[in-house]
Amino acid sequence: MHYMGLNEIREKFLEFFESKGHLRLPSFSLIPQGDKSLLLINSGMAPLKPYFTGEQEPPRRRVTTCQKCIRTGDIENVGKTARHGTFFEMLGNFSFQDYFKEEVIPWAWEFLTSDEWMAIPKDKLFISVYQEDDEAYDIWTQKVGIAPDHMVRLGKEDNFWEHGSGPCGPCSEIYFDRGPEYGCGKPTCGVGCDCDRYMEIWNLVFSQFDADGKGHYERLARPNIDTGMGLERLACVMQGVGNLFEVDTVQSVLHHVEHLSGKTYKQDDKTDISIRVITDHIRSCTFMVSDGILPSNEGRGYVLRRLLRRAARHGRMLGINRPFLVELVETVIQSSESAYPELREHDAYIKKVIGTEEANFARTIDAGMNILNNMIDGLEKAHQHLLKGLDVFKLNDTFGFPLDLTKEIAAEQGIEIDEDGFHAEMKKQKERARAERLKKNISGWSEDLFGGLDAEPTVFTGYNTLTTEGVVVALSDEETLTDAISTDDQAKEGVLVVLDKTPFYAEMGGQAADHGVITGAECSLRVLDVKKTPKGYYVHTCVLESGIVKVGDHLTAKVDKEYRMAIARNHTATHLLQAALREVLGDHVHQAGSYQDASITHFDFTHFSAVTPEELARVQKIVNDKIYESMNVTVKEMPIEEAKKLGAMALFGEKYGKVVRVVDIEGWSTEFCGGTHVKNTAQIGGFKIVSESSVAAGIRRIEAVTGRNLLIRANLQEAMLHTVANTLKANNITSLPIRAEAVMAENKAMSKELEEIKAKVAASKVDSLFDNAEEVGGVKIASAYFTGTTGDTLRGMCDSIRDKAVNPCVAVLVGKTDDKITMAVTVNKLAQEKGLKAGNLVKEISAIAGGKGGGKPDFAMAGLKEETKIDEALAAVKGIVEKQLG
């Protein structure tokens, strides 16, 4: 056995199983695809579940991978010991109803012990098998030749893989004996002991049964193989090191942490914890961001935020009082890019996301820590040990302290937190937000109004027709259900109509509802909005313009064709926009929200910086190019697995059924979508981005117009330009830039002239300023309050005072313009020699009027808040100067 780097070990493993007929697959994303049971991929087998369950056909019966994984179940222990980490890589070889124990056991032994591969001494390896698995035991002892004293039979708890119902089976684990120095010293120490001597490096799982979850097992006709070997653990063996933080690729990151902090690893237990936390967490964060995860307060985004902020806090504990994590990203990339080239492809984006998140936290961490420490001090003085849920909530809401971070910091001081109280406050916040959303809802009715309706769900016909005959199954005036509603003498608003069939699209998926009319023999209604209830009823919010409408009436529902078309233009354009953004900005762009009505579309997407004007121009050009190419837009319903194979983009977090609706634009854009669309991109007419902005951390928004709205907007802008041209007395729009430059030049000249006049006025004021000056300790003191005087003018006056004064002097001047009050203090050189400094004076004097400021020994400024205390502050100047003279 000789030293081997982690990257070399990974490649050797994959090469070995390729030589055994396996297809090498790249690591899957850390984001589970179609598996709601997982937040993050945490094993080599996890992304391959569909192949094991038969939901999908594997690309080959034999597959090998090195899968990046993250586990955060024991995050609070990461750093405290060298055994725990959140990021790891899992080597694996898999058989989908192909080979079984007879092949996989000898292969595992060959890879570990052959001189061509790992060359681990055979006497260092021990094997465990399930106590009833004689087949595996015999293969190990008879075919491979393992001595019985290196074999151990263990029970179901240790050597049987089972997770509820479904495929399961016994497993066989391979252990490496690290030597007695790692052991517990007990006579009973052996494989299965809790000490560190026997380290499990490879688990071979034999899926040969189908469990019903009730203790019954049926043998599978065609069993599977699933193996997993921790790459970092094997690297510990091959490099002869004690733990994962000493493995070469991890060490490179750890050494960088040492360099940034000026601390040395293994010299102080407390320091070591922080170094390990940062080393581990930055590796996880780098890979998570590379796979498109962004910091947030929910789900995997919360995990990322928690890791980043925990690492940032430990940086503070090492004395790194600035954002620094982004500097470690490059080291992580360099150590792993040979196996994960996407890290290098996304390096700028990864650094931007991590840098921005850390900078955001840096702005609040110190204030938050001070508040938390004060809370803990207060508890200790009161001999209490429970931090209130409301206080924990405030730390989260105001300073961005995740619950777990507060919990960890408090635990270090022996303080517990009221988690139930915290969650109660979070629930209240969500309820407040929900109430606000309900206030903004244009319809005042509650979904509960139709909750007891005993009728079939409304049939939506609007994909194929804009006109449908329907029967009224329910009516309401937004307060109660009723059998009939009439207009009396005037139109009646807030009439809610439920039909058995409707062509009206209800507001959902970010698309606004259709408008139109519902008419019958005795009534005419104008439809303003449509909502779909959880039970599937389409509720039309209408104005009853004439007549009477009754339950049971047969009516004609007709959608406004042009209004529907305007929405369709915007919706299809949004699909083109997302594809264009991914092409220009990168594959990390994902939809985070959208809204389309007849006048505008806005699209929210994941991106961590403002989109540059150049990038926006490229995006806009791409969308318009696709419009002018007259691409066909096709809509199909298909099984969800078929849609995924086509590469259809789904909205993250959205729940889909077995059959989905897919909107495809000639393969250039393919998305799951239930909305209405044009049939050809040429019908969009044109696309114009009107704004780009931030709506949340890591979320940008683009607003755009299409079709006739583009022309309307252009006409409005042209009219505005004509108005500006007339105001500036330009001959026409084309000469507007020249005229604007001329006006700016005139304005600049007048501003210069005004400043010269102000300077002369200031000079005249300065000349008389010391006429009635007081004197303290040989220093002349002048103070004055000027209205209509800017800070720049005060600065000029102070410069003039210092230039002209021949004796020690101090001047304290206050100026006010609009609502801004400024104080300026100057101390000439002769007064400085007596120990006076402008910066010290301005701090003490301005504080009287609620001000704050500072500066240099000769000049300082402050902003004042309390105008009523200006006279008091100026009256105190003499005493403060006298005090500071000593």
Predicted regions: what they are:
Residues 1-886:
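A glycine- and charged-residue-rich anion-binding loop/surface
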